[in-house]
Amino acid sequence: MSRPALLAVLVMVAVVCGCRTLPAPPVAAQSWEARRAQLQGRDHFQIKGRVAVAAAQEGFTASVRWMQNGTQSQLALDGPLGVGGLRVTTDGTTLVLVNAHGERLDSEAARAELKMRLGFDAPLASLRFWILGVPDPSSPAVEVVDVERRLTSLQQSDWQIEYADYVAVKGEWLPGRMTLRRADVRVRLIVDHWDS
């Protein structure tokens, strides 16, 4: 084979080898892991929005505010709820509920009142994570993530959470709309404002 012909063959082999598709590295899985860990570690944020709850044969809508300050979560619901609103504060072990009349209930009485008002046991400990678009690290979960490394659905603690919309907040994607379902309970949350 002549030198020009050999050179042409070598160039063709190099071009063909250079054009082959390499498998994508598993960056997305690692990136989701890093994003999830970062958001699960976030302990200061606030949202304002609207919630629609359907539980058994009952339902209501309300404005909602969630404030996370360290391990303390504060939930404020204003709307029908039979009396106009309520405030719930929990640190994961204790629960305090203050109703629209200023009456304060603690622990089991607060849990019973909250369940009666909402129509279901609210997963408050997990909500602080689900609001951020990540699973609660304290229990197993089944996660479905999109190409942007955002949860689209989550199954955890008998709840199914669907994330329908994300909004850009200070350079990162945070949930704008989600639906939580369990048995005969459906909760739709629309976040109108993030303060992270």
Regions flagged by a language model, labelled:
Residues V13-R36:
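Bacterial Sec signal peptide processing site at the extreme N-terminus
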Residues V64-M67, V88-T90, A164-A168:
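Extended lipid/amphipathic-ligand handling interfaces
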Residues M1-C19:
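Sec-dependent bacterial lipoprotein signal peptides
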Residues A100-S157:
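Flexible, processing/modification-adjacent segments and terminal tails
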Residues G133-S196:
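Gly/Pro-enriched, hydrophobic low-complexity segments
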Residues Q72-D121:
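An acidic-aromatic
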Residues G49-V53, V64, L75-L77, T152-Q156, ...:
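Short beta-strand segments that buttress and anchor functional surface loops
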Residues A37-Q57:
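A short, Trp-centered hydrophobic/proline-enriched beta-strand micro-motif
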